[in-house]
């Protein structure tokens, strides 16, 4: 007889452990257990059957893998938490006994970061364990940057100390400096939540969100203890990443930081970057110069060096002669700068995207310009984006902080002026003659400096996303800005694409309906009656009969006119019925040949759609029940998407018509 297994010794009951059991096993408090799980990347699991897993009568809600908790038993941070817990117990017992001297002694020997400056524990080994390679750390950098940029803009409270905010801000500015030097920034988008940025670092696309520089309110329903635990981990991670990135481009980390400039609002200007070998090069130069002054070169060594240099020159002359001969032989096969075109091998094959050649570097888009930022513009994101795309000279008003190229708005070297204020009518003199904007010495409302381009801030973002300089006239102060589209969303084939013209993506049925609506509106504006049109037609027919010579031709013309009249009457009845069904006013209008053709096309399309629907229903009848349900779900989703796209196209068509009427 086989041995009967005890309940809870194998299977799911052994693979899972409740949170209460895990806390008891690790001998930790619940807040420390949460911290440890967040830092080590251990998350709750959902078993298939909670009744089989739960060993108690009460239903447990949080479960972990037993192997994960077993893995935490060997964590060095566990001993740090235990030591801190023991120390707190000793201090509380001493105070309970009234022994203040012992409590003070325990306090002095404790590791206090605020007093000693040394951290109570470090997370360096956790970073190395969770991210074995640098690319793994880059893939997990999205949430890290979003969280740190968020905390860098928060006000200091008891839950969010000022030191944490300052460190977050410093790490973020160091990361931005790397993006500026390496030109790794690719795209940016202004949204309601904040500003999205996308950078490409060593082949990895990193997307993060930066909130706007507004005063943030701290609400009580947010648990900043949990968020602070994540921030503590992310600060260590970004410190590692910044060090690796700076080292990869030969910069010293951390960069020099000027506290006084930072207090005056310099931000990016408070840092000064240095190369790794700058200090050592200076020392070696000084040493070699001193040696050269004390000792001269050895004459024997100098003679051997001269001999070797002479032989090298002879070899170079021979190689030049052979190179000229090879160049003459290869003149017939000169390489061209043209780019190869990828053409499909067979008809109906895949069409590959063609390579694009651009002589201009997108990373140096603003390199030749000098910008001036008005006081109402967001200085921090504009400065970062302009510097990341090659601009070296950015000025702003002294109210916005230090670090500007110039604080003089009338500097003649300024080429672009970014302004975001409404257009104000310029005041006129008593004589009625307004002051010339180009010759004004003092800039007043709605006055401009000559030879300077004035644009709104959106111009910078659209130029960056399209990798080309947009027309400044579209972004002039007071002008209606073009739509700011997200560069991260690419329209799928068949979906509505706002960048394409409406005619290129609307269906044939939509185009016919739009033409018929235009024709109805035009006829309603004309107000012509069918009876008057009939009289005119009959008069024309009479004239033709008088001019006609042959009776057969006259009879044929009469028959054609009668057929046209019958067709026009039937179409007129159809339009009247449609107007009555839609609740519109019935008008007697003449149906011209174009409208007839459109109506016939619409009839043909409706007939074709009915036939396709019937064929589809017959095909669905051949499917199994399971496949039929799946197909109906797919069909419902596609119809819903097409209806949304149709609404967007109709809205755009209406806006374009209104715009054309105003123009």
UniProtKB/Swiss-Prot annotation:
Q: Where is this region: Disordered?
A: 311-360, 428-447, 504-663
Keywords, ordered alphabetically: Coiled coil, Nucleus, Ribosome biogenesis, rRNA processing
Pfam families referenced in this protein's UniProt entry, alphabetically: Pescadillo_N (PF06732)
The encoding gene is nop7
Compositional bias segments (type: Basic and acidic residues): 311-321, 591-620
Q: Which residues form a coiled coil?
A: 501-663
Species of origin? Neurospora crassa (strain ATCC 24698 / 74-OR23-1A / CBS 708.71 / DSM 1257 / FGSC 987)
Q: Name one GO biological process term.
A: maturation of 5.8S rRNA from tricistronic rRNA transcript (SSU-rRNA, 5.8S rRNA, LSU-rRNA)
Task: Provide a Gene Ontology MF annotation, just one.
Answer: ribonucleoprotein complex binding
Tell me the domain of life.
Eukaryota
Question: What GO terms fall under cellular component here?
Answer: nucleoplasm; PeBoW complex; preribosome, large subunit precursor
On whether Coiled coil is a keyword of this UniProt record, the answer is yes
Query: Which family does the record claim for this protein?
Result: Belongs to the pescadillo family.
Keyword Magnesium assigned:
no
**What is the designated name of this protein?**
Pescadillo homolog
Entry function: Component of the NOP7 complex, which is required for maturation of the 25S and 5.8S ribosomal RNAs and formation of the 60S ribosome.
> How the protein assembles, per its UniProt entry?
Component of the NOP7 complex, composed of erb1, nop7 and ytm1. The complex is held together by erb1, which interacts with nop7 via its N-terminal domain and with ytm1 via a high-affinity interaction between the seven-bladed beta-propeller domains of the 2 proteins. The NOP7 complex associates with the 66S pre-ribosome.
Subcellular localization = Nucleus, Nucleolus; Nucleus, Nucleoplasm
Q: Where is the composition biased (Acidic residues)?
A: 322-334, 526-567
Where's the BRCT domain? 361-477
Q: Which positions carry the signal peptide feature in this UniProt record?
A: none
């Amino acid at each position: 007889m086989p041995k009967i297994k005890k309940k809870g010794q194998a299977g799911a009951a052994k693979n899972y452990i409740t949170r209460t059991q895990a806390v008891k096993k690790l001998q930790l408090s619940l807040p420390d257990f949460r911290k440890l799980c967040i830092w080590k990347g251990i998350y709750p699991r959902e078993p298939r059957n909670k009744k089989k897993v739960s060993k108690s009568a009460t239903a447990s809600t949080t479960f972990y893998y037993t192997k994960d908790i077993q893995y935490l038993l060997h964590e060095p941070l566990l001993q740090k938490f235990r030591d801190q817990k023991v120390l707190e117990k000793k201090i509380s017992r001493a105070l309970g006994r009234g022994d203040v001297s012992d409590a003070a002694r325990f306090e002095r020997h404790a590791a206090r970061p605020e007093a000693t400056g040394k951290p109570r524990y470090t997370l360096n080994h956790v970073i190395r364990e969770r991210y074995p390679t640098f690319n793994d750390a880059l893939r997990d950098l999205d949430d890290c940057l979003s969280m740190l940029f968020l905390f860098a803009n928060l006000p200091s409270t008891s839950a969010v100390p000022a030191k944490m905010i300052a460190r977050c801000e410093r790490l973020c500015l160091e990361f931005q400096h790397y993006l500026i030097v390496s030109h790794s920034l690719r795209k940016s988008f202004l949204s309601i939540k904040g500003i999205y940025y996308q950078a490409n670092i060593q082949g990895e696309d990193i997307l993060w969100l930066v909130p706007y520089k507004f005063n943030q309110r701290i609400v009580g329903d947010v648990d900043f203890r949990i968020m602070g635990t994540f921030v503590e981990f992310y600060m260590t991670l970004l410190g590692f990443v910044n060090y690796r990135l700076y080292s990869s481009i030969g910069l010293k980390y951390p960069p020099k930081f000027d506290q006084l400039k930072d207090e005056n609002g310099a931000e990016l200007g408070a840092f000064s970057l240095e190369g790794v070998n700058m200090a050592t090069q200076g020392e070696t130069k000084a040493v070699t110069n001193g040696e050269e002054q004390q000792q001269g070169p050895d004459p024997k060594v100098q003679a051997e060096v001269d001999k070797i240099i002479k032989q090298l020159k002879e070899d170079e002359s021979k190689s030049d002669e052979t190179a000229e001969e090879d160049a003459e032989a290869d003149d017939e096969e000169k390489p061209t700068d043209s780019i190869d075109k990828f053409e499909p091998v067979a008809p109906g094959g895949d069409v590959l995207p063609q390579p694009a050649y651009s002589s201009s570097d997108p990373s140096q888009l603003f390199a030749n310009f000098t910008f001036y930022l008005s006081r109402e513009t967001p200085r921090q994101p504009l400065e970062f984006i302009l510097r990341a795309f090659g601009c070296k000279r950015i000025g702003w008003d002294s109210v916005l902080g230090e670090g500007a190229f110039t604080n003089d708005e009338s500097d003649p070297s300024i080429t672009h002026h970014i302004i975001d204020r409404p257009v104000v009518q310029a005041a006129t003199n008593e004589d009625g003659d307004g002051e010339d904007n180009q010759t004004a010495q003092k800039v007043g409302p709605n006055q401009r400096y000559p030879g300077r381009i004035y644009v709104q801030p959106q111009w910078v973002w659209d130029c960056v996303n399209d990798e080309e300089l947009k027309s400044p006239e579209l972004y002039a102060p007071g002008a209606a800005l073009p739509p700011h589209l997200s560069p991260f969303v690419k329209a799928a084939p068949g979906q509505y694409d706002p960048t394409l013209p409406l005619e290129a993506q609307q269906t044939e049925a939509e185009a016919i309906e739009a033409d018929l609506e235009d024709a109805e509106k035009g006829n309603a504006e004309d107000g012509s009656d069918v009876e008057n049109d009939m009289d005119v037609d009959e008069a024309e027919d009479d004239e033709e009969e008088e001019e006609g010579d042959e009776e057969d031709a006259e009879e044929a013309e009469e028959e054609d006119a009668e057929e046209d009249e019958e067709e026009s009457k039937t179409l007129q009845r159809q339009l009247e019925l449609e107007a009555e069904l839609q609740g519109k006013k019935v008008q007697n209008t003449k149906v011209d040949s174009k409208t007839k053709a459109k109506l016939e096309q619409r009839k043909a399309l409706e007939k074709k759609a009915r036939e396709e629907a019937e064929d589809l229903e017959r095909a669905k009848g051949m499917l199994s029940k399971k496949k039929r349900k799946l197909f109906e779900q797919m069909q419902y989703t596609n119809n819903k998407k097409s209806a949304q796209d149709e609404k967007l196209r109709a809205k755009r068509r209406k806006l374009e018509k209104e715009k054309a009427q105003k123009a």
